[in-house]
């Protein structure tokens, strides 16, 4: 029998707090800079590009949260478990390494520094300044996530509302005094005919679908701390709160993309969205605006960093319990600090190939998890879909590497083979093989199920 505490009915305020936690964990460095840059690249085609971006940047993260809820999973490991413990561990390590200390977490520090602080510093001081800034940044992330039960209050109740207030102020000023007409903005060549697909691929850079799987354990821990102990109650809270969070994120994405397209009335396409954001804020607020931007970026990046290092430590402590949560937390923060000092450009250049590999695998696993009740979570369906997806995804990864790999004899050979696959020129060479794998897996599943039913009838 559940106690009165465990059966406590949550109020709408409780759902909003969990949604705020999810929002804060999802919405980080890339969520500000990539949609803004997309708006500049797409110009007048910003609407079509936005649809593609919202599929991978909003719909897929929502499905990842629903996958956690439907399967009663605690984290990445459980999502991959139908394929066996070995695959689940490898998948968990790859996801956490990518969104964690290798790329995602270091990016939170480098974006906030590059956009928020670097403009105020001479170039010869930026290396040392990044070293000091990233050290302080990850010390703060360590402190906020040190006590697991405080993550909800620290992120959902303190940092996130402050960030939303600052972002709202930026939107009010930008749309009250627009820099240009988005309908007449110039369109870059890639977005003249491929706005939808390019927007779809640009959504990979947010890493939110991967983050949704990784944050599962953090959110589940927080919800259980609110008195929801049984799996059904936890799943219900996660699903409802997840919907609220991604709807808010989607609305902000649209505003950022539109703001990027409007900025072309005053500026050329920038090197990245961080530079564009800095330019826009500087027009409206001058030095004060830049200081506000520095503070805003640091807040949003810190909220994401807290979630990433906590999720890394929680998942790894769960599966490797001989090492404490705090030791994993310290390792994550230290590794992220070291990676951050390679700089933003290096991090982005080397993260793209991993995303081209992991996103297709994550997409199919998320969709399989959501629809798993239809085929009773049969591992054979998972096996064939992943088998047919992993090879072309590896090809996409090799082609996306910097030229030292992609232009090598090996890279060129892989690219030549990959070009024979449908949709390869769009970066979606995995899609048709994945569908073929799904058909094969379902056929095997239903044939196997029918045989078992026949045997039972004979008995």
Task: Describe the function of each predicted region.
Residues 59, 63-64, 162-174, 209-211, ...:
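Selective recognition of specific alpha-helical transmembrane segments in multi-pass small-molecule
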Residues 68-78, 136-159, 225-228, 337-350, ...:
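Membrane-water interface regions at transmembrane-helix termini and the short interhelical loops
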Residues 75-81, 252-302, 309, 318, ...:
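TM-loop-TM module centered on a large, flexible mid-protein loop between adjacent transmembrane helices
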Residues 147-158, 196-199, 219-248, 266-278, ...:
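Hydrophobic, small-residue-rich membrane helices and short re-entrant helix-turn-helix hairpins
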